From Swiss-Prot:
Domain RRM: 51-158, 166-246, 317-395
Main location: cytoplasm
CDD domains found in the cross-reference section: RRM2_HuD (cd12774), RRM3_HuD (cd12656)
Cellular component GO terms, alphabetical: cytoplasm; dendrite; growth cone; perikaryon; ribonucleoprotein complex
Function field: RNA-binding protein that is involved in the post-transcriptional regulation of mRNAs. Plays a role in the regulation of mRNA stability, alternative splicing and translation. Binds to AU-rich element (ARE) sequences in the 3' untranslated region (3'UTR) of target mRNAs. Mainly plays a role in neuron-specific RNA processing.
Keywords for this protein: Cell projection, Cytoplasm, Developmental protein, Repeat, Ribonucleoprotein, RNA-binding
InterPro entries in UniProt: ELAD_HU_SF, HuD_RRM3, Hud_Sxl_RNA, Nucleotide-bd_a/b_plait_sf, RBD_domain_sf, RRM_dom
Region of interest (Disordered), residue spans: 12-48
Name used for this protein in its record: ELAV-like protein 4
Ranges of Polar residues composition bias in the record: 34-44
Biased composition (Low complexity): 18-33
Protein family according to the UniProt entry: Belongs to the RRM elav family.
Length: 400
């Protein structure tokens, strides 16, 4: 990756007014993601959270030096860390809570976090000396296009009960409703962090299902009170607005078992795909919500404690993709799974002698709900002359 002259480019760059592309196929945050206001404006941030930033959707091949160079062009940095796969070189879990709650980085000693040369997980943290530089970094770099990614820069919010479980699931939306109209409908109840309308990956037509994440749970509660059972403009039926379920709930585990485990087949392949897709969509509509704010939030991590669901690893949810063509490479997997949410890493398994794809690969996604939705949408998807088989990775899945 070439970064020469980057500082000069950044210094002349106009502040970004959008957090990402408007296309539904972009590999990065959706365009509805808000520019995070200054903590001085909201009055809700602590002193520490005025300088700590989380950066999502970074190119996988971006180095620590490039990451520091990019954000160092804004102002003096106290610490800057690109998070890497702990299995391939990084140990950060013991120190994660210090970062997420806005406290200062621990020194890089033998007892501190080791940021080695493992595979990048696509996100990192920056802690500035001056809060004004942190604010400038958000205004300048949020929405910046790097390779195929559009990065998202926001304050690393402290863990608090008031900001947990603020995700809403909305169904029964008019098929003609746009993302902007969805936001306009809900914005009267509070600050929207992210929103999303699910579309059919083949036709591009809305599925009538959307997700809204508010800044605070109380705002989400007010939206449920005000809009659940109401008919928005253009709707033939009342919409349903409810909290997106936590994947650790028993109902979700039971539904997941129905979705992805079959006594007769090793993989949930494309047979009777249209009927299966209808069943998958209905089950997912009952159980799952998409979390789009951050790849690592305290509530997101604690919700995974004690779970025993196929595909869960220490770095996210591993998805097995089968029946890829010999010419497939990692970019194919990025393009397929990127629109569904935060992708930590992708890997195409290649033949040692020919370096051609052996027909399968793996994708690790940060959020369970996004991974489940990607599987439901892409299992049975026709890619060229092949029909993909997509499922959560299990112990019986092909070894890499």
């Amino acid at each position: 990756m070439e970064w020469n002259g980057l500082k000069m480019i950044i210094s002349t760059m106009e502040p970004q007014v959008s957090n990402g592309p408007t296309s539904n196929t972009s590999n990065g945050p959706s365009s509805n993601s808000r520019n995070c206001p200054s903590p001085m404006q909201t009055g809700a941030a602590t002193d520490d959270s005025k300088t700590n930033l989380i950066v999502n959707y970074l190119p996988q091949n971006m180095t620590q030096e490039e990451f520091r160079s990019l954000f160092g062009s804004i102002g003096e940095i106290e610490s800057c860390k690109l998070v890497r796969d702990k299995i391939t070189g990084t140990q950060f879990e013991e120190h994660f809570k210090d970062l997420a709650t806005g406290t200062k980085w621990k020194p890089l000693t033998e007892e501190g976090p080791i940021f080695g040369k493992g595979q990048s997980l696509g996100y990192g943290f920056v802690n500035y000396i001056d809060p004004k530089d942190a604010e400038k970094a958000i205004n300048t770099l949020n929405g910046l296009r790097l390779q195929t990614k559009t990065i998202k820069v926001s304050y690393a919010r402290p863990s608090s009960a008031s900001i947990r479980d603020a995700n809403l699931y909305v169904s029964g939306l008019p098929k003609t409703m746009t993302q902007k109209e969805l936001e306009q409908l809900f914005s009267q109840y509070g600050r929207i962090i992210t929103s999303r309308i699910l579309v059919d990956q083949v036709t591009g037509v809305s599925r009538g299902v959307g997700f809204i994440r508010f800044d605070k749970r109380i705002e989400a509660e007010e939206a449920i009170k005000g809009l659940n059972g109401q008919k928005p403009s253009g709707a033939a039926e009342p919409i349903t607005v409810k909290f997106a379920n936590n994947p650790s709930q028993k109902t979700s585990q039971a539904l997941l078992s129905q979705l992805y485990q079959s006594p007769n087949r090793r993989y949930p392949g494309p047979l009777h795909h249209q009927a299966q897709r209808f069943r998958l969509d209905n089950l997912l509509n009952m159980a799952y919500g998409v979390k789009r704010f951050s790849p690592i939030t305290i509530d997101g991590m604690t919700s995974l404690v004690g779970m025993n669901i196929p595909g869960h690893t220490g770095t996210g949810w591993c998805i097995f993709v089968y029946n890829l063509s010999p010419d497939s490479d990692e970019s194919v997997l990025w393009q397929l799974f990127g629109p569904f949410g935060a992708v930590n890493n992708v890997k195409v398994i290649r033949d040692f002698n020919t370096n051609k794809c052996k027909g399968f690969g793996f994708v690790t996604m940060t959020n369970y709900d996004e991974a489940a939705m990607a599987i439901a949408s892409l299992n049975g998807y026709r890619l060229g002359d092949r029909v993909l088989q997509v499922s959560f990775k299990t112990n019986k899945t092909h070894k890499s």
